[in-house]
Structures are given as C-alpha cells and as structure tokens.
Amino acid sequence: METIGNLWLYVAFFGIVIVMLLVDFLGFKQKQGQDVSIKQAAYWSVAWVSVAVLFGGGLWLYLQQTVGVTLANQKTMEYFAGYLLEKSLAIDNVFVWLMIFAAFANPAALQRKILLYGVLGAIVLRTLFIFIGAWFVQEFSWVLYIFGAFLVYTGFKFLKGQEEETNIEDIKILKWLRKHMRITPQLDGDKFFVRQNGLLWATPLFLVLILVEASDVIFAVDSIPAIFAVTSDPFIVLTANLMAILGLRAMFFLLAGAASKLHYLPYGLGIILLFIGAKMLLLDVFHMPIWISLSFIVIVLAITAYLSLRHNKKQLHS
C-alpha cells in the first residue's frame, strides 16, 4: 500500500502525541473538587485544533521538500478532510460519555480521570484498528464496498433519527461485569479497585471506564471506515484520527452544557456519512478529487451549525 509514512515521520508524530498528552494532563490538573470551566475547556479545545492545524502545515512543508508540491497538496488535503470528518463524528461520542457519567452520577474530578484513561485507551485501540483495516484494504480491496454499504446504512439511521435511547443498565457488557465481578455498591474516591476482607473488588468507577472504552470501540466502527473513503494511506488515516480524538477531553467539557443545542448535528453527520459511503461504492466508476470531499464536509458542518443556531434563537423567542 502506498504511503508517505516512514520511520521518522511516525517517531515525530508519536513524539508530538506524547508531549501533548503530558501538557494536557498537567494543564487540566485541577484541585480536588474544582470543576473545569467552560472558558478553560474552550482554550484547550482551541489549543488542540491549533496543534492539528500546525501539524498539517508542517506535514505539507516536509512533503513539499521530499515528494513535490502536487503530492504534498493532495496528502495535506486528505489529512484535513480526514481530521474534520473524525472530529465531527467524535462529537457523538462525547454525547454518549455524557449519558454514561450522568447515569453513574460521577463528579467532574472523576470524569477528568476517566477521560484521560479513555483517550489513552482510544489511542492504542484505534492505532491497532487502523493498521488492521489498512491490511484488509490492501489484501482484500472489496472490503471498501462493505465499508461503503455500512456507512450508507449508518447515514440513513442518522437521518431517520434511529439513534434510540439506551438504558445503561440494559447494556450487555455491564450486565456481564456485574455478574462475573465483585463490584462495590459505592465509589471509593478515585480508585478502580479496593481490597475488602482480603478480596479484590472493582468499584463503579471501573465500570464507567469500561463503558467509556467500549463506546469508543463502537464509534470507531463508524469513523475508521469513513476515513478510509478519504484516503487509503495508513499514515494519513492514523494522524488525522488521533489528532481528532486527542482533544476529546477538552471537547467533552466544552460541549457538556451544549449537548441539546446542536439540534441538527445528527442530520449533518448522516449526510456526510451518506456522501462518504456513496463515494466508496462508486470507487470504480468515478474518482472524486479530494478537494471536493473536503469542501463538502466543511459546507455541511457549516450549514448544520447555522441551522442549529437559528433553531436555538427561535426557541428563545417562542
């Protein structure tokens, strides 16, 4: 499979990831019981987006010197298209986390710890999924058509509003954990496990961590096939995907109070998934330039945001 990735690019990228995770951890470290403010979350969200943009710019400069302007332009547009796609799909992930935290009544201080581990787990799992997916696409090109059909199906579900309400207690993995593990009835600070009468017990916080990780695995099933419609280069898929999820902690606290205000987001995501799925299904018939995909994603997200703002204003005046 053709890729611009080499050892030094991967080392540089994961070096940036490690440094930014440390900065994120130290920057978001709050005093016990102190909540993350909307202002602080907004600053960190802007910082993460800025890092993603700067990485894209640095990638373009590097590729311009090594492989030429034409390929540099193409790969950079693929990166930004993939980043926007993954960032928009990640918003739905945030809403599920809100539901999980609300169901377990976790305070903000514990949410920060869970999300830190959640993002770290997502980095490992998504990296694994991406390279497995890249291998499948290289060895079995027909897999792209399965991805395309699945994305079209998911897009229709978004448009028809079939994102049904989920009762946390009905989730199978939670039932299995409660049945096969010793779970304490209450939290014990920020501990995942405690010893009682010589036996190891898991706390409800451990259940929350498992649900957060499981939800990301489920959403990765949507998002990773979608980005393979934008590019088949595993380096671009990986960097765009991880850059999008690295800022999820800040995005979570920023959107925590605005979940109900993004009224038209599911419809916008549905349209984008339909577009991406159709593009995959028509690979052998029509090759769509990457700038069209990038422009389409930007326009749909902009229209979605505009319509949501109008909807909110109408509700305020009604």
Enumerate the predicted regions with their spans.
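Multi-pass alpha-helical transmembrane bundle typical of ion/small-solute transporters
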Residues: 1-318
